[in-house]
Amino acid sequence: MDNKFLTRWVFSTNHKDIGTLYLVFGIGSGMIGTALSMLIRLELSAPGTMLGDDHLYNVIVTAHAFIMIFFLVMPVMIGGFGNWLVPLYIGAPDMAFPRLNNISFWLLPPALILLLGSAFVEQGVGTGWTVYPPLSAIQAHSGGAVDMAIFSLHLAGASSILGAMNFITTIFNMRAPGMTMDRLPLFVWSILITAFLLLLSLPVLAGAITMLLTDRNFNTTFFDPAGGGDPILFQHLFWFFGHPEVYILILPGFGMVSQIIPTFSAKNQIFGYLGMVYAMLSIGILGFIVWAHHMFTVGMDVDTRAYFTAATMIIAVPTGIKVFSWLATIYGGAVRLDTPMLWAIGFVFLFTIGGLTGVILANSSLDIVLHDTYYVVAHFHYVLSMGAIFAIFAGFYFWFGKITGYCYNELYGKIHFWIMFIGVNLTFFPQHFLGLAGFPRRYSDFVDGFAGWNLVSSLGSTISIVGVIWFVFIVYDAYVREIKFIGWVENTGASWSSLEWVQPSPPMSHTYNELPFVYGSYSALRPRNS
């Protein structure tokens, strides 16, 4: 390994190279997470045990959740697309703190190794991603596995907090002259709001898991009633992080879809730009005051439950504004159904279904029945597996040419979309029926009455796996054929609505050696010299 390679990839201070590292790391982690999900669906494809005991099943479920959240969606959306695009969008030469950016990435591989390693220590972490005590306490999980998982979360959390500080500073301080906040592309807004959510929510998680660590190892009793503690306190702390976290996972997806839809509808800008910004801000703020809707079954006062029900439903309003603005952008446009647009439309449609089941679950009385059933699993997988992941694929196909300089095969991309669309819907739609029938989460075995829909669900996941393998082939194919990427903008008739298309594809290692000057409304940003 020569020195030049080390300098470029290990000691990198270039936002593009670090963004590429994040993307590659995220895709690699996603493969592991997908393999784990396939193991889950194999175990559940028929009654009876396949993998072994319940505990092993729960270890797989826990690892699947942590990997998909902390090592796929966040690194790809915020670290990958965020690093690559935010400086390009705002006309900045790089991120504000390039070396901080480097360590933000390099904290993640050790975190992943710790998480995977925890499965090989004693019996592994069979707590679910929520890590509730007393199951995660030393009595139920003796040995070092949970401690390793906690340390893994500390590293991943530190990485995200440092990255968030970097993005906030960059977006506030490094915008090109004329790039005022009301001209900021929606993707940049989404990353900014996400960064604030990370900065405010992750320290609470860090506090909670540190208290759990001391409970396990130093005889404190934060979460042990025998010593005057309360396990419900952990749930409050965890979900105060956990609920903003789900918006952290989806907001950059909103931003990406908001960049893609106007381009393929031949529109200069999104419908209702300012409304979109305020909607994202509202979602970010409301996300912090609804956390206890995850805890309707722990025995809260009826008036507390009423408040959290109402507050949760209010989030549907800004979300609805976003959905209808996307639809209004498409309406009347010369829509071109290229691959990124297919993913974006799929995102809007399926995310809306996930949102509707979310409104149902917001009712505390209904949630008491549906809590910890597969209805909840179906709900958040519609939002994540078909919201976040579809947005990631939309962004990947949209910016693939910009990042690599190569064209992927358009037909192959569309085939990928349809395989995944059929696969994920076949996987998760039947889970609504299972949940309504009372099939509980986190069980590896079940009575025969649930066998039918579980088999359908497992067939769907097999189709999704084929889609993932096909995706790897598409990337390989693009690199082998080396067809030069020209650009979407020339093809779709939209004007340059953002700065990144002014750059060549792939962009030079250092962009904006001279600061661009941005003028005109949001709808027609151009550097002065074009």
From Swiss-Prot:
Cross-linked residues, 1'-histidyl-3'-tyrosine (His-Tyr): H243-Y247
Cofactor note: Binds 2 heme A groups non-covalently per subunit. Binds a copper B center.
InterPro entries: Cyt_c_oxase-like_su1_dom (IPR023616), Cyt_c_oxase-like_su1_sf (IPR036927), Cyt_C_Oxase_1 (IPR000883), Cyt_c_Oxase_su1_BS (IPR023615), Cyt_c_oxase_su1_dom (IPR033944), Cyt_c_oxidase_su1_bac (IPR014241)
Pfam hit, one: COX1
Transmembrane segments: 20-40, 59-79, 105-125, 148-168, 186-206, 237-257, 270-290, 313-333, 341-361, 380-400, 417-437, 455-475
Gene Ontology CC: mitochondrial inner membrane; respiratory chain complex IV
Pathway in which this enzyme or protein is active: Energy metabolism; oxidative phosphorylation
Record bears the keyword Ribosomal protein: no
Binding site for O2: Y247
Coiled-coil boundaries: none
Keywords: Calcium, Copper, Electron transport, Heme, Iron, Magnesium, Membrane, Metal-binding, Mitochondrion, Mitochondrion inner membrane, Respiratory chain, Translocase, Transmembrane, Transmembrane helix, Transport
Annotated positions binding Cu cation: H243, H293, H294
PANTHER family tied to this protein: CYTOCHROME C OXIDASE SUBUNIT 1 (PTHR10422:SF18)
Function per UniProt: Component of the cytochrome c oxidase, the last enzyme in the mitochondrial electron transport chain which drives oxidative phosphorylation. The respiratory chain contains 3 multisubunit complexes succinate dehydrogenase (complex II, CII), ubiquinol-cytochrome c oxidoreductase (cytochrome b-c1 complex, complex III, CIII) and cytochrome c oxidase (complex IV, CIV), that cooperate to transfer electrons derived from NADH and succinate to molecular oxygen, creating an electrochemical gradient over the inner membrane that drives transmembrane transport and the ATP synthase.
Subunit structure and binding partners: Component of the cytochrome c oxidase (complex IV, CIV), a multisubunit enzyme composed of a catalytic core of 3 subunits and several supernumerary subunits. The complex exists as a monomer or a dimer and forms supercomplexes (SCs) in the inner mitochondrial membrane with ubiquinol-cytochrome c oxidoreductase (cytochrome b-c1 complex, complex III, CIII).
Protein name: Cytochrome c oxidase subunit 1
Phylogenetic classification of the source organism: Eukaryota, Metazoa, Cnidaria, Anthozoa, Hexacorallia
Gene for this chain: COI
